């Protein structure tokens, strides 16, 4: 299965119990910031934005004072799982990032999708990739 298939079928899929609702954007990146696959609406990001995210996984709390930036948008960092999941909020939407052994799995959402729905979609794929040694 290609990485694009994981994005299209497992991240950008219709949400269970919510016909017509799905994440607004998603991607799978290598921990070096290389794009493995992304949805068409995933924001153009800067290398330093990914560096900040990877630093926060290694040093939890790094992004809290400045916020998480992706594609020029600033997200307020909210409770995540140190070293495993970063969650951010921006207005009526937000972001969930799950770290696996080799990748970063991104999901972005806007209302009516809830933070919990985004977390479930992103973390389920991230957990699967971890189980596969990826």
UniProtKB/Swiss-Prot annotation:
Function recorded in the entry: Binds to actin and affects the structure of the cytoskeleton. At high concentrations, profilin prevents the polymerization of actin, whereas it enhances it at low concentrations.
Coiled coil: none
Assembly description: Occurs in many kinds of cells as a complex with monomeric actin in a 1:1 ratio.
GO molecular function: actin monomer binding
Residues the record lists as Phosphothreonine modifications: 114
Cross-referenced Pfam families: Profilin
Keyword Cytoplasm: yes
Name of protein: Profilin-2
PTMs per UniProt: Phosphorylated by MAP kinases.
Motif Involved in PIP2 interaction mapped to chain: 84-100
């Amino acid at each position: 299965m290609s990485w694009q298939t994981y994005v299209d079928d497992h991240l950008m899929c219709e949400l269970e119990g919510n016909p017509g609702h799905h994440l607004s954007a998603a991607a799978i990146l290598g921990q070096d910031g290389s794009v493995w696959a992304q949805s068409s609406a995933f924001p153009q990001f800067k290398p330093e934005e990914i560096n900040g995210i990877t630093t926060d996984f290694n040093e939890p709390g790094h992004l809290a004072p400045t916020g998480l930036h992706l594609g020029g948008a600033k997200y307020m960092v909210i409770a995540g799982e140190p070293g495993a999941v970063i969650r951010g909020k921006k207005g009526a939407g937000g972001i969930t990032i799950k770290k696996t052994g080799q990748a970063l799995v991104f999901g972005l959402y806007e209302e009516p999708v809830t933070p919990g729905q985004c977390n479930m979609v992103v973390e389920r794929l991230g957990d699967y990739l971890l189980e596969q040694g990826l």
